Curated annotation (Swiss-Prot):
Belongs to the UPF0125 (RnfH) family. It holds the Pfam family Ub-RnfH. NCBIfam families: PRK01777.1 (NF002490). It comes from Proteus mirabilis (strain HI4320). Transmembrane segments: none annotated. InterPro entries: Mopterin_synth/thiamin_S_b (IPR016155), RnfH (IPR005346), RnfH_sf (IPR037021). It comes from the Bacteria. This is Protein RnfH.
Length: 97
């Protein structure tokens, strides 16, 4: 069996986790996440809700990983991006007046 190395990454506002994991060729994104033990380190991760990706590209838990991949677990947005842009623009307008 061919061994491969991947990284599992998860970022909180105050701490980032990047965990290297040795897997077997043909293993999935979900297997990489489980092997990293990130689910026990960060108990706020719910794989039924959190989206995942490989190098910033959306992925499914069933997708195969390749040697050198970085599996990323994404947190849900806490603010609407459109609303935040509107507030920044309004604040900038007030500064120029």
């Amino acid at each position: 069996m061919t061994k491969i190395w991947v990284e599992v990454a998860y970022a909180l506002p105050d701490k980032q986790y990047v965990i290297p994991v040795e897997l077997t060729l043909g293993d999935t994104v979900e297997q990489a996440i489980i092997a990293s033990n990130i689910l026990t380190i960060c108990n706020d991760i719910d794989l039924t809700k959190n989206k995942v990706g490989i190098y910033s590209r959306p992925a499914k838990l069933s997708d195969n990983v390749r040697d050198g991949d970085r599996v990323e677990i994404y947190r849900p947005l806490i603010a609407d991006p459109k609303e935040m842009r509107r507030k920044r623009a309004e604040k900038a307008r007030q500064k120029t007046e």
